[in-house]
């Protein structure tokens, strides 16, 4: 798979930047008004009762701020956060080590929680429900189970694939929050805030232009701003203007709707070789040289969201909107 400027997944270079840009409170957090309002109520209620917050599941596309929200929850509750991920917890002992290190009220954040092995989930169930841990000591006939009490804690799980969670695990979360794609105005505010942190001057129209092409995703908006800033410093006077922004994004092959060369390859492949579809996923995969699960999980969601692609029982179909975007006429039936 090509390294994508427009991927919502976190890249290595994003990590330090995202940490420095991360808001510390719900008040500072831009967007996700519904999830934010609900969390404000649940956090305030837990603090009034002097209890830990119910376990929270944050789900939605990558790059929308799930990790940021997990840190904000801990900050608002006045506790520490321990961060790990589904793939990093390989054995029940790994999970036990993390759980036994928690202090009362702490937040345990597990990113990509859908990738936990089922055997590890089973260790997690009593920990979430009863704040205890069942450990098997020894092997064979002499093996015995020992129950350890854990301090009350809040598990915050994050996933891009809520449907991949097992029902028993999903049902143990008291708070489920779906994060939605951001509006252009919200992203523009995020771009201007990031530019302020960078100490870069930016025109409001340039911030809007970056926001329009950021696919509803703050991580992509910040990444595009970094690249446009480079052009502003080398090709301009350091100010991110509309002219510099349009030039930079054109050279980066990011079109006015936030589509890149891979999106173009996928859509035009279906249009030119299969008259717009319907065509099966495996055939599309062979045509553009990408794995089918990558097409389904990475490339298609945004195209479906903006109405350029349809999934039907007979296969993928390119819509009239996509033809219009490319200035092409739909084939006559």
From Swiss-Prot:
Q: Which UniProt keywords apply?
A: ATP-binding, Cytoplasm, DNA damage, DNA recombination, DNA repair, DNA-binding, Hydrolase, Nucleotide-binding
Per the record, a Pfam family? RuvB_N
Q: Where is this region: Small ATPAse domain (RuvB-S)?
A: 183-253
Q: Which domain of life is it from?
A: Bacteria
Family membership:
Belongs to the RuvB family.
Please give the function described in this protein's UniProt entry.
The RuvA-RuvB-RuvC complex processes Holliday junction (HJ) DNA during genetic recombination and DNA repair, while the RuvA-RuvB complex plays an important role in the rescue of blocked DNA replication forks via replication fork reversal (RFR). RuvA specifically binds to HJ cruciform DNA, conferring on it an open structure. The RuvB hexamer acts as an ATP-dependent pump, pulling dsDNA into and through the RuvAB complex. RuvB forms 2 homohexamers on either side of HJ DNA bound by 1 or 2 RuvA tetramers; 4 subunits per hexamer contact DNA at a time.
**Protein name (database record):** Holliday junction branch migration complex subunit RuvB
Q: Which organism is it from?
A: Bacillus cereus (strain Q1)
The taxonomy runs: Bacteria, Bacillati, Bacillota, Bacilli, Bacillales
């Amino acid at each position: 798979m090509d390294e994508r400027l427009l991927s919502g997944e976190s890249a290595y270079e994003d990590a330090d930047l995202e940490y420095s840009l991360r808001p510390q409170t719900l008040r500072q957090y831009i967007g996700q008004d519904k999830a934010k309002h609900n969390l404000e109520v649940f956090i305030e209620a837990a603090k009034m009762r002097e209890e830990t917050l119910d376990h929270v599941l944050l789900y939605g596309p990558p790059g929308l701020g799930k990790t940021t929200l997990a840190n904000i929850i801990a900050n608002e509750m006045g506790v520490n956060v321990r961060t790990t991920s589904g793939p990093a917890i390989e054995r029940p002992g790994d999970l036990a080590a993390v759980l036994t290190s928690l202090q009362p009220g702490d937040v345990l954040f597990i990113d990509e929680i859908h990738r936990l092995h089922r055997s590890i989930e089973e260790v997690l169930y009593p920990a979430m429900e009863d704040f205890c841990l069942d450990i098997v000591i020894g092997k064979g006939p002499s093996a015995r189970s020992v129950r350890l009490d854990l301090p009350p804690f809040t598990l915050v799980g994050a996933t891009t694939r809520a449907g991949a969670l097992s029902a028993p695990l999903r049902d143990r979360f008291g708070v489920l929050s779906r994060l939605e794609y951001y509006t252009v105005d919200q992203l523009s505010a995020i771009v201007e805030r990031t530019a302020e942190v960078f100490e870069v001057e930016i025109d409001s129209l340039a911030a809007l232009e970056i926001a329009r092409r950021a696919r509803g995703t703050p991580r992509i908006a910040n990444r595009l701003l970094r690249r446009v800033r480079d052009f502003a410093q080398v090709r301009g006077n350091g100010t991110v203007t509309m002219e510099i922004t349009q030039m930079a994004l054109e050279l980066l092959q990011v079109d006015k709707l936030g589509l890149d060369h891979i999106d173009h390859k996928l859509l035009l492949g279906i249009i030119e070789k299969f008259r717009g579809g319907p065509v099966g996923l495996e055939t599309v995969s062979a045509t553009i040289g990408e794995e089918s699960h990558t097409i389904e999980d990475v490339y298609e969601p945004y195209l479906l969201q903006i109405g350029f692609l349809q999934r039907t029982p007979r296969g993928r179909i390119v819509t009239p909107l996509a033809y219009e975007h490319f200035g092409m006429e739909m084939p006559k039936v």
